Amino acid sequence: MARAAPLLAVLATVLTTAAAGGDAPPGKIAVIGAGIGGSAVAHFLQQHFGPRVQIVVYEKGTVGGRLATISVNKQNYESGAASFHSLSLHMQDFVKLLGLRQRREVVGRSAIFGGEHFVLEETDWYLLNLFRLWWYYGISFLRLQMWVEEVMEKFMRIYKYQAHGYAFSGVEELLYSLGEATFVNMTQRSVAESLLQVGVTQRFIDDVVSAVLRASYGQSASMPAFAGAMSLAGAQGNLWSVEGGNKLVCSGLLKLAKATVIHATVTSVTLHSTEGKALYQVAYESDKGNSSDFYDIVVIATPLHLDNSSNNNITFEGFTPPIEDIQGSFQPTVVSLVHGYLNSSYFGFPDPKLFPFANILTTDFPSFFCTLDNICPVNISASFRRKQPQEAAVWRVQSPKPLFRTELKTLFRSYYSVQTAEWQAHPLYGSRRTLPRFALHDQLFYLNALEWAASSVEVTAVAAKNVALLAYNRWYQDLDKIDQKDLIHKVKTEL
């Protein structure tokens, strides 16, 4: 009888979890990953299914994922995603919902460095900046702006669709609903090809567009046009951050959802079934040993790419047909926070007092770094001022590889400390020819599928809302809300 006790306990768990059906909400939901995607989807799932659903979030690292900070000289600085676009509507909603505040902006000028000299410099006068763009590049910047605005206007439809409860089972279906074949084709055509077609000059692409893409993705203008448009939109709008650190959004959403966070590495998801309902067993390893539990719904909110850079070894067992491998590579990005004195001579300013820039983007050369920013801490007091160029400041250097000592000495006259964070930040666009699906099985979902079309914090939040709606609509068999065509007219009719 003692031997039977564990079996009875497991059976009881299975039967309780499988009490789904009809109008009954799911008993337990697993979310794998506690970055912005996992945190947001936990919040949305609780919002849709109600407060009784039990949500368990597995995280092998730190809550926040690619939203993270590093402490330098007793101040915290963003080491992951640093800012959000003014049109990041989900992120704005999260900040308001959690009672957080946007960080006070400390203005600084930007420039684009071409290896030997600055190819474009921002001034304090808006009209002079426009004149310089026109003088150097003609109306290319206007054509770029029109192209980006057209893409963003269509992309913003997703918020209206989601407000009406519509969801999509695949990335291609989502993109088609927003921009039809044009959006889908933009995942296969390059930024450069698309911009040349609308009259943007090659020189403008080489000098300006490439610099923005290197800053956002660490990639070139040969990357797909859709991801490029999302990146270029971010360069044109007002940017903002969260006072106290962007990662506060993740911890706040998990707390709001009353989610249970288990610090463990998920090793497998196994399909079971009871009374015709899918049931998923999630196995994991933690400091306390190996264990597993059963769930009605599982959301994977961490990359599933398979390449040499991946340490994600989740296996899928019992599925027929087998779960398709998400093949593709990720772009490594190293963020170095350097507390020191900038070597302004390298940028053509022998006198550091005369160096006017706080943000430096780069073209394809030099290749050893992508951006260099004089950054502010996550907590900014009313009396805070940006360090003068001749003073020791905290600089954020973004590079494709860890910086060698010689490279650090190239950028800095001297420094007190260097702290780094290495990220598999974005997909290496072009390494995968097809777009993955959100729905891997009946109630098994892959939230990070959307980053293979474009990657940003807000795009991940959009994917989180889509997956929550998809799970909800599938659970209650509301199929009219999934993968609908011609949604723009349907939504107008509903209004």
Swiss-Prot record:
Cofactor annotation: FAD
Swiss-Prot/TrEMBL keywords: FAD, Flavoprotein, Glycoprotein, Oxidoreductase, Secreted, Signal
GO molecular function, one term: prenylcysteine oxidase activity
Signal peptide per UniProt: 1-22
Main location: secreted
UniProt key word Signal: yes
Name by which UniProt lists this protein: Prenylcysteine oxidase 1-like
Gene coding for it: Pcyox1l
